[in-house]
C-alpha cells in the first residue's frame, strides 16, 4: 500500500479545492449585472472557486454586523485589478478575538481564528445565531488561497 498518502488538512484543501471552494477552472455564464443605474444581461467569465473565496470572507464581515449591529456601520469592498487584490473590511469590533496566546492551543488567538481550520466560536448549537459562518472554514479558506492576508 505504498500508494496510500496522508495529507495535512491544508494540503488537502490545496490539492482538492473542489471539495472546499468549487471548481477552479473558469466558466462562462450570463448574469444580470448592475451597469450604472440599470441592470443589463452580460456574459461573464469567472472562477467559481474565486467567487466562493470572496463570498467566504464577505460573509465573515457581514457576520460581524449580525453580532454587533449598532457597532458596524460600514462594510467595504475594494478591488485593485492591477495589484490583483481584493480588500474586504468592516468597522466593527473584533468581537472577542483578543491578541493573546490561546492557553489550550499554544498559538496567538488571531492565528487560531484566521489560520487554523475547524476553529469557530459558532459551535455551540444551544445558542441561536443568525450568521453565515458555522463550520470553521470561511476566513481560513480565504487565507489558504491568498498570497497575502491581513
Language-model regions, residue ranges each:
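GHKL (Bergerat-fold) ATPase N-terminal catalytic module, capturing the glycine-rich phosphate-binding loop
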Residues: 1-150
Amino acid at each position: 500500500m505504498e500508494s496510500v498518502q496522508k495529507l495535512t488538512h491544508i494540503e488537502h484543501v490545496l490539492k482538492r479545492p473542489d471539495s472546499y471552494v468549487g471548481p477552479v477552472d473558469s466558466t462562462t455564464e450570463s448574469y444580470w449585472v448592475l451597469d450604472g443605474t440599470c441592470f443589463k444581461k452580460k456574459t461573464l467569465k469567472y472562477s467559481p472557486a474565486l467567487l466562493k473565496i470572496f463570498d467566504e470572507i464577505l460573509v465573515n464581515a457581514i457576520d460581524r454586523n449580525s453580532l454587533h449591529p449598532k457597532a458596524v456601520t460600514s462594510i467595504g469592498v475594494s478591488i485593485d485589478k492591477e495589484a490583483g487584490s481584493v480588500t474586504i473590511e468592516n468597522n466593527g469590533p473584533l468581537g472577542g478575538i483578543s491578541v493573546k496566546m490561546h492557553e489550550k492551543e499554544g498559538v496567538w488567538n488571531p492565528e487560531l481564528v484566521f489560520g487554523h481550520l475547524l476553529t469557530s466560536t459558532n459551535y455551540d448549537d444551544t445558542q441561536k445565531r443568525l450568521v453565515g459562518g458555522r463550520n470553521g472554514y470561511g476566513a481560513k479558506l480565504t487565507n489558504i488561497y491568498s498570497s497575502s492576508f491581513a
